[in-house]
C-alpha cells in the first residue's frame, strides 16, 4: 500500500487512497484532504498485530471538525491476520477455551476500533467504517456462522460500522461470494444489522472469477446481483484495484489501474463502474500507488471533454 502522496488537482468521483498513518488521525486525514482526496483508509495500528492505537477526545473533535468542513469519507482497515471464525483448524465458540480467548482478544480491539472510527467519521452525509477480512475455515457453512457469532459479541455504539470485504478465494478464505456475505449478515442479530456494511474489492472479485470487470455489461451485472442478493444500501465502500492475477485464478494480487488484467486494455468499464458508484453514493479507495489518483484525474478530464 502506498506511503506518500503528491498534491493533485481534481477527481470528479468520491475517490481516495490508503494512506500511511501520520502520528495522529487528524494529521492523517488532513494529509489526504490536502492531496485532493475525498476518501481515505489507514491502519489504526500494525497491519499484522491486533493492538490498536488509542485516539484522544481532542483528536475526535479535530477530525469531526475536518469532516464537517471538507467532503471526506473515513475508513480504517483491520489487521490482515484477523479471523472471526477462530482459526483454519479450530472454530471459535466451539469448546476450545484457548481459541476462544484469542478470538475474544481480537474482538476487544475490533470493538474499540469500530466504535472510534464511527465517532470520527460519523458525520451527516459522510460514510465511515472498519474494513475486515471476515475469516478462514475449512468447513464453509460452520465458518460463516461462527463469523456471525463473533460479530454478535461486539457492542456497537452510535454510527459504528463494520465492513465485510469479499475475498479472492485462496485457501479456506470465506466471504468469496455475495451469497456468503449475505449468510453472515443474516446470522447477525437484528439489532446489530444496521452496523454491518460491505466493502467490495475489484481485484478480489475478478481474481475469484465472479465478474469480468473489464467488460461493461459485467459491471452492470455486478450491481444488479449485489442489489438482488444483499441490497445496494449495504454497499458502503469500493476497494478500487486492478489485478495482476488472471480472471478466476483465486489469487489476490493488486495492480495499479491500467497495469493489470482488468483495465490493461481500456478504461471504458472503469468509467461505468465509477459512474454507478457515484450514482449510488459509494466512495472508493485505491490500495496501490499514488499514480492511480492521477490516472483517475486524467480519466475524469477526458470524460468531461
Label for each model-derived stretch:
Residues 1-107:
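N-terminal pre-domain/capping segments
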Residues 13-19, 38-42, 74-78, 130-132, ...:
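Hydrophobic faces of well-ordered beta-strands that scaffold small-molecule active sites
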Residues 16-22, 45-47, 79-81, 135-137, ...:
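Active-site beta-loop-alpha junctions enriched in small/polar residues
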Residues 30-37, 55-75, 111-125, 151-159, ...:
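Acidic (Asp/Glu)-rich catalytic clusters
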Residues 53, 89, 93-104, 141, ...:
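Gly/Pro-rich active-site loop or hairpin
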Residues 68-69, 83-197:
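Active-site acidic/histidine proton-transfer and metal-coordination neighborhood
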Residues 279, 283, 287, 291-294:
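Short, charged alpha-helical segments
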Residues 292-305:
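C-terminal helical cap(s) of enzyme catalytic domains, especially alpha/beta-barrels
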Amino acid at each position: 500500500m502506498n506511503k506518500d502522496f503528491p498534491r493533485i488537482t481534481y477527481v470528479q468521483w468520491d475517490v481516495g487512497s490508503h494512506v500511511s498513518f501520520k502520528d495522529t488521525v487528524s494529521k492523517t486525514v488532513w494529509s489526504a484532504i490536502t492531496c485532493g482526496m475525498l476518501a481515505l483508509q489507514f491502519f489504526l495500528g500494525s497491519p499484522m498485530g491486533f493492538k490498536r492505537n488509542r485516539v484522544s477526545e481532542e483528536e475526535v473533535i479535530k477530525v469531526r471538525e475536518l469532516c464537517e468542513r471538507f467532503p471526506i469519507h473515513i475508513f480504517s482497515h483491520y489487521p490482515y491476520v484477523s479471523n472471526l471464525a477462530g482459526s483454519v483448524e479450530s472454530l471459535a465458540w466451539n469448546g476450545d477455551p484457548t481459541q476462544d480467548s484469542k478470538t475474544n482478544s481480537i474482538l476487544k480491539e475490533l470493538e474499540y476500533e469500530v466504535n472510534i472510527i464511527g465517532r470520527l467519521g460519523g458525520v451527516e452525509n459522510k460514510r465511515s467504517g472498519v474494513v475486515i477480512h471476515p475469516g478462514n475455515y475449512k468447513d464453509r457453512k460452520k465458518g460463516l456462522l461462527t463469523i456471525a457469532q463473533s460479530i454478535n459479541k461486539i457492542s456497537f455504539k452510535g454510527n459504528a460500522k463494520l465492513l465485510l470485504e469479499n475475498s479472492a478465494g485462496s485457501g479456506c478464505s470465506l466471504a468469496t461470494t455475495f451469497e456468503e456475505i449475505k449468510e453472515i449478515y443474516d446470522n447477525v442479530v437484528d439489532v446489530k444489522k444496521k452496523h454491518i456494511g460491505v466493502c467490495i474489492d475489484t481485484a478480489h472479485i475478478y481474481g475469484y472469477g465472479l465478474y469480468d470487470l473489464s467488460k461493461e455489461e459485467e459491471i452492470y451485472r455486478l450491481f444488479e446481483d449485489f442489489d438482488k442478493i444483499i441490497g445496494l444500501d449495504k454497499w458502503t465502500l469500493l476497494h478500487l484495484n486492478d489485478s495482476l492475477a488472471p480472471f478466476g485464478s483465486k489469487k489476490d494480487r493488486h495492480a495499479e489501474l491500467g497495469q493489470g488484467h482488468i483495465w490493461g486494455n481500456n478504461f471504458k468499464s472503469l468509467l461505468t463502474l465509477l459512474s454507478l458508484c457515484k450514482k449510488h453514493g459509494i466512495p472508493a479507495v485505491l490500495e496501490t500507488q499514488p499514480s492511480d489518483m492521477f490516472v483517475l484525474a486524467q480519466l475524469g478530464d477526458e470524460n468531461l471533454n
